[in-house]
C-alpha cells in the first residue's frame, strides 16, 4: 500500500454509523475496547454502550507459562433499565439513526431481551439497518455466560439477526446438536438460515476439521454459496480476538457489498497479523509472570487492520451452493 493510497483511505468519508453493545474493560482489550477502534479506523462512526465495565477482562488465555487469568476483576454491570434509559435518550433526540447494530457479550437474560427490543425499534425505523450478532455464550465445550441466555438468543435474537458469528460450541447450543465435523457445522448453519439469518460465519472450533497445524472457519450466505477457510494455527489463545474479528467483518461486508468470501479472507489476514504481533511481543518480555503482556497489540497492528496484507497461507474453497 502506497503512502498516497493510505492517506486517501484515511480521508475517505463514509456514511456509516454503528451502535455497538458489548462489554468494556479499562485495561487491556475485550468487547468494545476491541471493536470500536477497528471500526473507527475504517471511517465508521461508532456509538457504544457498555454492557459491563470491568477493570480488566476475566477470560482465560493459553500462552507460555503465564497465569491463565487475572487474579482480580472489579467493575459494574449495566442493567436493562439503564439500557432502556440510554436508548430512550437517543430516541427522544432523534439520534437513534444507525446503519449497523453490533452486539457481543451480554451478562444476563433481561438485558439481552432489552437488546432485542432496541434492535426491533431500529429496524422499524430503518429497514436497511444491518444487525450483526456475536452470540457470546462459551467455547471449547463450556459456558462462560449464564446458560439461560441461550433460549433468548435462539428465540428472540436469531430471528432479528442479519449476520451471526457463532463459534462451533455456540452453534451447537443454538441448534441443539454438538458440532464435531464439517457436516455437523453445515447442517446447523442451514438451520440458522431457515430461521431467517442471511449470513452465518462459524469462526472456530469445528474440531473434526482442524489439525495441529491449521484451523478452519466457515461462511454461508442463505440461498447462495458456502465457503471453507483454512489458515495457520498460531501459538496461543488471546482474549478479544473474536470481538476484533466481528468488527472487521462489519467493515468488509459493507465495503464489499456482502461478498462474504473476500470479506472473511481479509478479516483472517488482519487477524493473523494481529495474533503474530501479539505473540512475538509476549515472547520478548522479561517478566514471564505478567498476565498483562498478552493483551492484544491492537494499536500496534493498525496498519494491518486498515489494509489487510496478502496472505497466501489462507485457503478459500467454495464447498456448497
Swiss-Prot record:
EC supergroup of this enzyme: transferase
Record EC number: 2.7.1.35
GO CC term (a single one): cytosol
GO BP annotation list: pyridoxal 5'-phosphate salvage
GO molecular function: ATP binding; metal ion binding; pyridoxal kinase activity
Record-listed substrate binding positions: 23, 144, 243
Free-text comment on the cofactor: Divalent metal cations. Zn(2+) is more efficient than Mg(2+).
Record bears the keyword ATP-binding: yes
UniProt keyword Endoplasmic reticulum, yes or no: no
Record keywords: ATP-binding, Kinase, Metal-binding, Nucleotide-binding, Transferase, Zinc
Binding site for ATP: 203-204, 230-242
Reactions performed catalytically: pyridoxal + ATP = pyridoxal 5'-phosphate + ADP + H(+)
A Pfam family assignment: PfkB
Cofactor(s) needed by this chain: Zn(2+); Mg(2+)
Family from the record: Belongs to the pyridoxine kinase family.
Function description: Required for synthesis of pyridoxal-5-phosphate from vitamin B6.
Protein name as annotated: Putative pyridoxal kinase
Amino acid at each position: 500500500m502506497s503512502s498516497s493510497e493510505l492517506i486517501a483511505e484515511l480521508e475517505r468519508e463514509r456514511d456509516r454509523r454503528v451502535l455497538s453493545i458489548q462489554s468494556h474493560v479499562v485495561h487491556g482489550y475485550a468487547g468494545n475496547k476491541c471493536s470500536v477502534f477497528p471500526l473507527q479506523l475504517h471511517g465508521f462512526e461508532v456509538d457504544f454502550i457498555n454492557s459491563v465495565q470491568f477493570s480488566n477482562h476475566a477470560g482465560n488465555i493459553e500462552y507460555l507459562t503465564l497465569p491463565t487469568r487475572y487474579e482480580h476483576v472489579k467493575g459494574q454491570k449495566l442493567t436493562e433499565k439503564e439500557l432502556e434509559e440510554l436508548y430512550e435518550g437517543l430516541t427522544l433526540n432523534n439520534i437513534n439513526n444507525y446503519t449497523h447494530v453490533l452486539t457481543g457479550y451480554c451478562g444476563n437474560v433481561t438485558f439481552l431481551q432489552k437488546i432485542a427490543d432496541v434492535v426491533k425499534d431500529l429496524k422499524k425505523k430503518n429497514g436497511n439497518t444491518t444487525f450483526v450478532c456475536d452470540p457470546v455464550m462459551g467455547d471449547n465445550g463450556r459456558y462462560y455466560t449464564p446458560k439461560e441466555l441461550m433460549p433468548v438468543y435462539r428465540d428472540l435474537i436469531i430471528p432479528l439477526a442479519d449476520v451471526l458469528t457463532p463459534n462451533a460450541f455456540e452453534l451447537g447450543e443454538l441448534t441443539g446438536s454438538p458440532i464435531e465435523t464439517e457436516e455437523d457445522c453445515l447442517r446447523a448453519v442451514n438451520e440458522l438460515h431457515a430461521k431467517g439469518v442471511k449470513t452465518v460465519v462459524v469462526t472456530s472450533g469445528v474440531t473434526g476439521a482442524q489439525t495441529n497445524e491449521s484451523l478452519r472457519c466457515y461462511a454461508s450466505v442463505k440461498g447462495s454459496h458456502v465457503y471453507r477457510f483454512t489458515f495457520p494455527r498460531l501459538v496461543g489463545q488471546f482474549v478479544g480476538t473474536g470481538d476484533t474479528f466481528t468488527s472487521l467483518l462489519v467493515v468488509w461486508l459493507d465495503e464489499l457489498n456482502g461478498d462474504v468470501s473476500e470479506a472473511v479472507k481479509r478479516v483472517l489476514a488482519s487477524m493473523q497479523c494481529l495474533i503474530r504481533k501479539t505473540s512475538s511481543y509476549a515472547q520478548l518480555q522479561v517478566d514471564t509472570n505478567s498476565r498483562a503482556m498478552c493483551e492484544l497489540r491492537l494499536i500496534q497492528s493498525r496498519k494491518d487492520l486498515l489494509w489487510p496484507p496478502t496472505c497466501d497461507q489462507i485457503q478459500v474453497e467454495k464447498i456448497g451452493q
